[in-house]
Amino acid sequence: ELKEMLLKKYSGCLSRLRSEFLKKRKKGKLPKDARSALMDWWNTHYRWPYPTEEDKVRLAAMTGLDPKQINNWFINQRKRHWKPS
């Protein structure tokens, strides 16, 4: 009885929390066309691969990614593949 009452009262919260946890666990590659657009920018600006805020907004609109995803991609790309010259 108590269990049913609690489930009825908090089922909305529980399902929102469950979906939030599932989102956070989801990892994977970015879409191929988005990666391609980011790599094009990277290859063009390899000597100084720090996009401006305007570049990031344009890339986000072009790729359909969040600005945070764009930012993280560049951070990771520089860390893994860039040797300042």
UniProtKB/Swiss-Prot annotation:
Keywords: DNA-binding, Homeobox, Nucleus. GO terms for cellular component: nucleus. InterPro entries: ELK_dom, HD, Homeobox_CS, Homeodomain-like_sf, KN_HD, TALE_homeobox. The keyword Nucleus applies. Strongly expressed in ear inflorescence primordia and shoot meristem. Weakly expressed in embryos. Absent from leaves. Transmembrane segments: none annotated. Residues 22-85 bind DNA. Residues 1-21 form the ELK domain. It is found in: Nucleus. It comes from the Eukaryota. PROSITE patterns: ELK, HOMEOBOX_1, HOMEOBOX_2. Its main location: nucleus. Pfam families: ELK, Homeobox_KN. Probably binds to the DNA sequence 5'-TGAC-3'. Belongs to the TALE/KNOX homeobox family. This is Homeobox protein knotted-1-like 5. It comes from Zea mays. The lineage of its organism: Eukaryota, Viridiplantae, Streptophyta, Embryophyta, Tracheophyta. The gene is KNOX5.
